[in-house]
């Protein structure tokens, strides 16, 4: 970690709501891997119906960590914290999953929310307008969207691949935090030197930004003309992660509605990290 990137905290607490579907398995792997690398707190939540969920249906944390060969086979529950310095909590709640998630977010105040998405079949229920506004008022967390079936940074087998990050920047937002988050991701998860691709769409010149001093990254700058979302998705075909700035005044989720970021998340070939900024793609 370089002094320039140390000014922006990466992740100390993670929240991952799960519906126990196949589509959510890859998102779980990403949430677990980030918690493992950052030695931090992970809360996995399921809510719905008139009774609490079956604990056996929750994603198997210890079994997954054993498959990743970071825990010995048959390790006790206590080994997750004692051996790996990470805390994993499973929460089951009755009733509406969105309302339950909001309540938990208010208590936990996570730095990162990890969500599974279903691509062309629609974004999670969280992104409906009324729900989006409610969540936006209650959290400033970054949101990592992991499309079902995408090529993830983390595989179900625990393999890490992060070689190229796409970072679209606009004319007006302060790009510092987004750039720093890209560098931090490269330093933590990078497979060798990570290429950070700075993309600016429909501008005469590339907006100014500061490159933190780091040996973890190389840099490439692109300018393109055309529809912003379409262009970002075209360039993203060779990316492992997209980092999008969103409107800071309203929060990550609220800024997604009808935005370039929402369109990118729908069709992204890889995970998308939406992080708040002063202003962003609308």
Residue ranges and their predicted role:
Residues 92-101, 223-229:
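Charged docking surfaces used in two-component/phosphorelay signaling
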């Amino acid at each position: 970690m370089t002094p320039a990137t140390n000014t922006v905290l990466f992740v100390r607490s993670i929240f991952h709501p799960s519906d126990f579907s196949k589509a959510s398995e890859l998102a779980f792997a990403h949430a677990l891997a980030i918690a493992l690398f950052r030695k931090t707190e992970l809360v996995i939540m399921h809510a719905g119906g008139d009774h609490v969920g079956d604990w056996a249906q929750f994603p198997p944390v210890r079994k997954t960590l054993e498959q990743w060969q970071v825990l010995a086979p048959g390790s006790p529950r206590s080994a997750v914290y004692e051996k790996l310095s990470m805390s994993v909590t499973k929460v089951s709640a009755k009733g509406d999953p969105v309302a339950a998630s909001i309540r938990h977010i208010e208590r936990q105040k996570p730095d990162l929310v990890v969500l599974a998405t279903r691509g062309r079949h629609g974004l999670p229920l969280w992104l409906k307008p009324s729900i989006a506004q409610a969540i936006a008022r209650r959290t400033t967390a970054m949101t990592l969207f992991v499309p079902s079936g995408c090529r993830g940074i983390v595989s179900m087998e625990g393999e890490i691949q992060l070689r190229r990050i796409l970072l679209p920047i606009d004319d007006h937002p302060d790009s510092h935090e987004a750039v720093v988050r890209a560098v931090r991701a490269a330093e933590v998860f990078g497979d060798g030197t990570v290429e950070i691709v700075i993309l600016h769409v429909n501008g005469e010149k590339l907006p100014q930004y500061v490159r933190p001093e780091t040996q973890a990254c190389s840099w490439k700058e692109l300018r393109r003309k055309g529809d912003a979302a379409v262009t970002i998705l075209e360039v993203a075909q060779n990316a492992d992660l997209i980092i999008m700035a969103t409107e800071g005044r309203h929060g990550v989720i609220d800024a997604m509605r009808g935005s370039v970021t929402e369109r990118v998340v729908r069709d992204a070939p890889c995970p998308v990290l939406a992080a708040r900024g002063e202003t962003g793609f609308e």
